[in-house]
Amino acid sequence: MPYVGVGAQTVSTSLTGAPMVKAYIAIAASLIFVFCIAALGVHHSERKFNKFNKVSIDDIHKSDAGVIQDNIKTENIKKYLRIFTKDPHVAGTEANKKVAYEIANAWSEAGLEDVHTLPYEVLLSYPDFENPNSVIIKSSAGKEVFKSKGVSPVIIPDEQSGKYAGHQWLAYAGNGSASADVVYINHGTANDFKNLKLMGVDIKGKIALMRYGHGFRGDKIHKAQQAGAIGAILFSDTQDVAQDGVESENVYPKKIWMPNEGVQRGSLMHGDGDALSPYYPSKKELFKGRTIEEAKEDGVLPSIPVLPVSYTTGYEILKRLSGRPAPSDWQGFVGGNLTYKLGPGFVNGEKLSINVHSELRTKRIRNVIGYIRGSEEPDSYIMLGNHFDAWVYGSIDPNSGTAVLAEVARAMMQTINETSWKPARTIVFNAWDAEEFGLIGSTEFVEEFVNILQKRAVVYINMDCIQGNISLHVDTVPILEHAVIEASKQVENPSKRERSRGRKTLYDTWMKVFPDKKAGVPKIRVPGGGSDHAPFLNFAGVPVINFTFKNYTTWDTYPLYHTMYETPFSNIHLLDTDNLSVHKAIGQYWAELAKTFADDVILPMNTTHFASVMLKTYLPQLKTTISGINVSRSDFEDIRTQYALLSKSAQDLLTMSKKFQETIHFTQHSFSQNPYDPKHVNAVNERLKSTERCFINPRGVSMHNPSARHVLFSVSDSDSYSSSLMAGVQNAINSYDLNPTKKGLREIINQISIVQYSVICVVNTLRDVI
């Protein structure tokens, strides 16, 4: 019994196993005593309970966790990494199908149970690999003066020899060509478009030039198309991806910085999941609720041609732009001292055109699922996940995570086989397909099994990829913050330099590099979008943890993000040079979290902390937001009244959470006295599991994203990578600002009331009676 209380042995076995026989010999027990012990074991569990052994439950958990961590080996991670990144493997291709079955094979060989794939038929997008996309600049006389390559060059042939690996493209870009003046719009945020208009520059009928960073690329294109652009170009600025300079000695493969023809690929879909089957799983036998034309009309798929270019091509465009200089915070480092201008058009009458070759196709994708069944609560799921599809080789995103997850599975099964440890709750391993196109595999899975997940899933723990080598970085919901912090204290710091400075654990460096304003706490953000945790939290109300390793930098992600240069060379020689010690630490942290949630008697969920965050952080933020609404005094009083009622409910939640904490303490004490009577434990844990579900609004909180149903933490409408606190309230305020009507005012109040209803739901969930 993995989570038995004081009195359990550190190595528990079957009563008929060899270790048990040795124990009987060692203690020279009488036959009567043996009979009693055997009877007790048969009645209760295959795991022993010896009242003479004073080992505590914490000792047992720490010992088992230590064995699992010791069993995680870097040589295995390296082996898996090379297997999974041998070829380019875009979702929907035979190469990615092969990776799926290699993952399934690795998990099966490790000993996971019921390893299988789950297929879906989804709309994907591919370029014409025989005809690269291009940017062409012609003189006023019609002579071609510049043409982009459209293909990134091979730099390490042993790892980058796949056919078409260098092709530069963006999924779901509109097929076709566009010729027009160019307008520079910085990062393409909502404020950037607003400021461009204030500066008197019109984007209608133009080609938008935008930098990567500060938001999801699909949102940039969505805004550009809404503003009337007929095409768009995205480029990486050297101030983000080549900070040491663009010379060969300062970029890949000498350093981690992007080389001069590197390009970030990605998806432009505005939303998550299959574009043609919102709300429902995209199974072959089910009807598609939306057509391609409707998806374009709804803004889910772009209609205009779009392509990514290198900073070398970006320079060729920027140096020709006419018009007034861009604002200082719109300037970058492409071309060194080059001053970015807004346009429209070029100074010397030259003309630009873009040619994009893109095709939409329905393809089969497949998720991979495997289990370690729990010995006590097999219907309680601790879910671990990572996606495996990549834009090219994907050795960083995502297959650094894929390799680590395979090793976590192997190490756990090794521990099970060599000791008597087995998790109390079921650990589910998930490898998602087509994440890069818009979280498709995970979203379809959640849509298919949402009712089961809301009953069985305890937590979903996601690790997309390893982004740096300095510090752990964790996003999670407030109810899980204590758990992620405590787990980080149990894993040794992978950096020798950090350990020499007295920072022995992941927690120590995390606290140093990413401190919160609150003393003694590392910075933890609410999860946004951009990876497979999003549908679990936003659609199903399953609490999530999304973690990685990062550097303390000013750019959004690592410089080689979504380039063809993500091959094992980058992991081993540029990113994690001490024998993949960061990869190993990531695996140890993943395993520590999984084991904690699988084996802790009471689930490590803290509703008191959540209530405190609600009162001290979320409500003051909401108060500031509603104070800025332009309404009459009487109308504002109506809003303020509803806000006060929400505040009262949040205070009730804090009071009830403190009372519920007393119930938890009583339950833990009772369990330590009689670990074979878990009914009180089950009652407490069922309430804890249900709290996050209270915030799911079946009607949704976003018109644009059907996966957004969480009234507190749904993904932002303006940036799919970010979370939006109380998105329904914010969306109602935005709508009112555009069209101030009485109905719009009532909707603001209604959305505040919906948040209050969810808080009341948590209060009622924690009560003993209705």
UniProtKB/Swiss-Prot annotation:
Keywords: Carboxypeptidase, Glycoprotein, Hydrolase, Membrane, Metal-binding, Metalloprotease, Protease, Signal-anchor, Transmembrane, Transmembrane helix, Zinc. Residues 282-597 are annotated as: Catalytic. The chain crosses the membrane at residues 26-42. It catalyses: Release of an unsubstituted, C-terminal glutamyl residue, typically from Ac-Asp-Glu or folylpoly-gamma-glutamates. Residues 43-770 are extracellular. Residues 1-25 are cytoplasmic. GO terms for molecular function: carboxypeptidase activity; metal ion binding; metallocarboxypeptidase activity. The keyword Ribosomal protein does not apply. Binds 2 Zn(2+) ions per subunit. It is a single-pass type II membrane protein. SUPFAM superfamilies: PA domain, Transferrin receptor-like dimerisation domain, Zn-dependent exopeptidases. This is Glutamate carboxypeptidase 2 homolog. It comes from Caenorhabditis elegans.
